[in-house]
């Protein structure tokens, strides 16, 4: 009998708790829904404000879309309609902190539909789910001891790369920077080092990257259509590489730790299943895009700013030539050398602030929530903008001035410098990018000084900033008196 009464009491308490929880959630949701949506405009039917969002980048001023609306609505949060989706743009350090701190709680990563169509996974999962799996695989490849091993490989390839610059009076920087970073990615991800093989893959990757974030109209000649064709071509090439690697692993001609491709082939999931060839090709394709595109933009803009600012160039040269003098004949760069490149990295960071390869990124609201007094409905897309802090005079004094000293000591305030994102979604290849950029700077400045040929070359952002004419420069080798 006592057990019966005890059970009744427990049941009563449980029902009371559930009722209270229901009322609390209902009240909480009511409070959320009672808050207004952020101010803003949905633009034209169907396309919304997508064309204006993209066109400001094509004109070289992607921040204009952001700052014009901040000024118009007197709010750092505003609603819009982008890439076929209802969206809210979050601006400022507090917004960055909120989004990065609530990853997988209130928001999750989101890609436009064009990305899933350009990267048609061989599995029945979305690119979002595949990215989560990929991020679980990367730590072994990007752990400190692995990165330290890559420095020698990067140095070796950089030396071979800059041989193509020698005996040239003029070069066009951006395509050469892309060749350098793509060569590194091919070597370190899939052990493809032959220049002819790298070149065969490089051009389709350029087409793919330019059409990745585009209006998904699959008609002949559109950037989206060209991106799909390029993706299909690259996947076939990668499948051929994967098939050969399987043979090489079986015959002992390849090792299980030589690159991320071997790791993928030999690693099973929690159910003991191995990935299919097309699945691996999808993931390698994504890695090759992320592993070279952003760094090539950064390298090109480093060349641009060092040409415009000879006093900055002189300081970088001084640091790098001291490192070069400390090396014996044929001795490759080491981790200790990289740690000495402090001023060079401050310069690179200032370049990333003024010309961030990652202009921003999208999230999706997992639930209804409020922020800064505004209601954000479940399912709406959220875009955060790097430029909203990077060139904001309230965050960085005289924001358009090139000043590497901003990164001395503790550097910028948290959540204000976000070229690699932040929180759980921070780019896992940040340290990899740092190494390839610093190795590039080392070999560039110890060999050459240079001048821009087009003084006021236009910048185009699509989706990353690139010089409209590729940044042609005139080279002055250091061993030649000029």
UniProtKB/Swiss-Prot annotation:
It holds the Pfam family p450. Its cofactor is heme. It is an enzyme of class 1 (oxidoreductase). One of its GO terms (cellular component) is membrane. Heme binds at residue 427. InterPro entries: Cyt_P450, Cyt_P450_CS, Cyt_P450_E_grp-I, Cyt_P450_sf. The chain crosses the membrane at residues 4-24. Its main location: membrane. This is Beta-amyrin 28-monooxygenase. The keyword Iron applies. Keywords: Heme, Iron, Membrane, Metal-binding, Monooxygenase, Oxidoreductase, Transmembrane, Transmembrane helix. One of its GO terms (molecular function) is monooxygenase activity. Belongs to the cytochrome P450 family. It is found in: Membrane. Signal peptide: none annotated. Its EC number is 1.14.14.126. Disulfide bonds: none annotated. It is a single-pass membrane protein. It comes from the Eukaryota. It catalyses: beta-amyrin + 3 reduced [NADPH--hemoprotein reductase] + 3 O2 = oleanolate + 3 oxidized [NADPH--hemoprotein reductase] + 4 H2O + 4 H(+). It comes from Solanum lycopersicum (Tomato). The keyword Heme applies.
